[in-house]
Design a protein with these regions (language model features):
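C-terminal ends of transmembrane helices
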Residues: 3-7, 61-73, 116-129
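Small-residue-rich segments of transmembrane alpha-helices in multi-pass membrane proteins
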Residues: 24-29, 81-91, 133-150
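Structural signature of hydrophobic alpha-helical transmembrane segments
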Residues: 43-57, 101-111
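Hydrophobic alpha-helical transmembrane segments
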Residues: 33-36, 89-99, 151
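Helix-adjacent hinge/juxtasegments
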Residues: 65-96
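N-terminal membrane topogenic signal
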Residues: 8-23
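Membrane-helix boundary connector in multi-pass membrane proteins
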Residues: 97-108, 117-132
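Membrane-interface helix termini and inter-helical loops of multi-pass transporters
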Residues: 36-46, 154-155
Length: 155
């Protein structure tokens, strides 16, 4: 059994936290829409922006998970390692661009967000607001990446 302290109380994300989260998530649909439906000359920049933002957000979420784990009296090294690996995986996927087709890169980011979401929802004793925010981030990222993947596959 995991040896962690219990969550302090049930919390829902505040309005300010939702506002910040929505602003931080806005590059996902905006860049995916420009890549999929915008002028052709903007497609490369929009896709690059989407992939870089995916890398930044995956790295950030890994850092959040690391922070949640290090607050524990006895942090578990496996959870800390997974947190670091999420950030490393995001950078490896991004740096593989040019060596692998864009469809694989986009699919890699989709998979990374889904794995991270699954991990977040199986982590015991996190603040109750964290799974809700994690779902919003993963949902926004995955829908946007799926839209970009569809465009990349049909190009």
């Amino acid at each position: 059994m995991d040896d962690v302290r219990p969550a302090s109380r049930a919390e829902s994300p505040s309005v300010a936290l939702w506002a910040i989260a929505l602003l931080a998530l806005s590059p996902f649909p905006l860049t995916a829409l420009v890549f999929s439906y915008g002028p052709a000359h903007m497609h490369p920049s929009a896709l690059t922006s989407l992939l870089i933002w995916s890398t930044a957000v995956l790295s950030f979420l890994g850092g959040v998970r690391w922070g949640l784990e290090t607050r524990e009296p006895r942090p578990r090294w496996m959870r800390q390692a997974f947190s670091a690996l999420c950030a490393v995986a995001a950078w490896v996927i991004l740096l593989a661009r040019g060596s692998a087709p864009d469809t694989w890169i986009i699919g890699g980011f989709l998979a990374a967000f889904l794995v991270q979401w699954l991990f977040d929802h199986h982590t015991p004793n996190t603040p109750s607001r964290y799974p809700v925010l994690s779902t919003a981030v993963a949902g926004s990222a995955c829908v946007s990446l799926a839209l970009a993947l569809e465009k990349a596959m049909s190009a």
